């Protein structure tokens, strides 16, 4: 499965509130996975935190 940051603002299209518009990743919501995707430790933490900071947002498979 592919994983993407899903937000209440509009699914993949609303991923801008998660830190990157249209972001598609191969990892669930874990910092190690984001580090593997090249975000770096700080980037992974920030991305995950932003993704979960909006009501109804989070990671979803697609």
Curated annotation (Swiss-Prot):
Keywords: Antibiotic, Antimicrobial, Bacteriocin, Secreted
Broad class of the protein's primary localization: secreted
pH dependence: Stable between pH 5.0 and pH 8.7. Activity is lost at pH 3.0 and above pH 9.5.
Function: Bacteriocin active against the Gram-negative bacteria S.enteritidis, S.choleraesuis, S.typhimurium, S.gallinarum, E.coli O157:H7, Y.enterocolitica, C.freundii, K.pneumoniae, S.dysentriae, P.aeruginosa, P.mirabilis, M.morganii, C.jejuni and 20 other Campylobacter isolates, and the Gram-positive bacteria S.aureus, S.epidermidis and L.monocytogenes.
Temperature dependence: Thermostable, retains activity after heating at 100 degrees Celsius for 5 minutes.
Record localization: Secreted
Protein name: Enterocin E-760
GO cellular component, as recorded: extracellular region
Any one of the GO BP annotations: defense response to bacterium
Family under the similarity heading: Belongs to the bacteriocin class IIB family.
The keyword Secreted appears for this protein: yes
Superkingdom of the source species: Bacteria
Entry annotated with the keyword Plastid: no
């Amino acid at each position: 499965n592919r994983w993407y940051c899903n937000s209440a603002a509009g699914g993949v299209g609303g991923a801008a509130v998660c830190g990157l518009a249209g972001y598609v990743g191969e990892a669930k919501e874990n910092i190690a996975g984001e580090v593997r995707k090249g975000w770096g430790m700080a980037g992974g933490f920030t991305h995950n935190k932003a993704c979960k900071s909006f009501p109804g947002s989070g990671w979803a498979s697609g």
